[in-house]
Design a protein with these regions (language model features):
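Short acidic/histidine-centered micro-motifs embedded in hydrophobic/aromatic stretches
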Residues: 3, 29, 101-105
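Sec-dependent N-terminal signal peptides
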Residues: 3-13
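Short N-terminal segments immediately surrounding and downstream of signal-peptide cleavage
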Residues: 17-36
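Secretory-pathway/luminal and periplasmic proteins that interact with or process carbohydrate-rich
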Residues: 31-37, 105-116
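Alpha-helical segment that forms one wall of the substrate-binding/catalytic cleft
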Residues: 48, 53-110, 122-130
Length: 130
């Protein structure tokens, strides 16, 4: 068991990230590639990656929520969030899981019914841009 854990730790590069195509797809789907303080989800989401305040808070990133309007900062928020909430998917560059967690939260892969259908629809939108 210890050897397996050690192998997994050594096999996963620290700070690995999804491919650049994932970021472009996320940006395209979330805001149509727009930049700036874009409001979405009835004013509950902000910026080019449409981040909610709770998502930003869960990321643990220092700064202010208003900084999510900046694409580079928004990417840093998503990176920090995924490394906390979906570290294996992050390390593997698993775009499907990352997209679903981004859209549906850490429990997205356990979703059922309509929520699962909505997440699959979201993933198909992301796939079109990969």
């Amino acid at each position: 068991m210890k050897r397996t854990f050690l192998f997994l730790c050594l096999a996963m590069p620290l700070g690995a990230a999804p491919p650049e195509s994932f970021w472009r797809a996320l940006h395209a789907v979330e805001s149509g590639g727009k930049l700036g303080p874009i409001k979405g989800d009835k004013g509950a989401a902000l910026g080019p990656l449409q981040l909610h305040k709770a998502y930003w808070q869960d990321s643990g990133l220092k700064g202010s929520y208003s900084q999510c309007a900046d694409l580079a900062y928004a990417r840093a928020v998503v990176s920090a969030y995924m490394q906390r909430k979906a570290p294996l998917a992050w390390a593997a560059g698993d775009c499907r899981t990352l997209a679903m967690v981004h859209n549906g939260g850490p429990q997205a892969l356990k979703a059922e019914g309509q929520k699962q259908a909505n997440l699959e629809t979201y993933w198909k939108k992301i796939q079109k841009h990969l």
